[in-house]
Amino acid sequence: MRSHRRLAILDAPSNLGLKPPAPDREPGVRYMPNVLREHGLLTRLRAEDCGTVVPPPYVHSIDSETKVRNARAIHDYSLALAGSIGRLLYRGFFPIVPGGDCSILLGVALALRRRGNFGLLFIDGHTDLLTPDNSETGGAAGMDLALVTGTGPRLLTSIEGLAPFVKPEDVAVLGYRWPDPDSRSIALPAEPMTGLPLGSVQSNGADYVAAKVVKRFESLSFWLHLDVDVLNPAWMSAVDSPDPGGMTPDDLLTIVRSAVQSSRCVGMEITIYDPTLDPDRQGARLIVDLLSKALQE
């Protein structure tokens, strides 16, 4: 079924929330939007090109006050990204925002909070509920769900005094691996959040989980966060944390298609794909195919 929405692509090539892969290198997720464009994202989605929100320069050190890497830059970038997303929503577009790492969620959530209360469907291989006190990297990309729901330094949780950007009771977390191979990611979604781990998809089936998600948001407009590390590395290894297990592309498509075809879904972001880890661009083709099938077929 083709989308009757006005789709808009807004690139958010920020790597500010990740640790450097080496002392003299930056994370390669910043190349994701360009590579997806090279593989036909705009034409396949029949979307309007709304340009790029350029991030501040990446700094390798961790902010001493917040214990978050690039904290001030993420704060400033969130303001810029929120402005651009807000304008697209005001004009009636369905924004599709390729990152970038998961810290771009702060700008998205700020844009939504300025407009009222929205839900968040958080599809991710990890819960991203770390804090500066238990994160070994200081990367906001592992803290983003905690930050947008009000836990963490006020510089990032209370931009414009709007904390929390998303109420915990309005969040559904889907696809996270548990037990988590990353022993640092000890936090599980707790009530009032809704938690649907990878095992729920595997035991109940993607159709059941997709229907449950749509039911969860039947009375609340929501945004879709999609971190492609939710996929099994057999299909998507070009991520910073390619842990064992994960969804199949078919199961993920079933859930994403159901979510974005809901009239309650107002937009989505895609994060963490790193083209520098994917020389044959298999991951890029998978992402473009998935989005095209979910939104246009």
Label each PLM-derived region with a short phrase.
Residues 2-297:
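Conserved alpha-helical scaffold segments that buttress catalytic/binding sites
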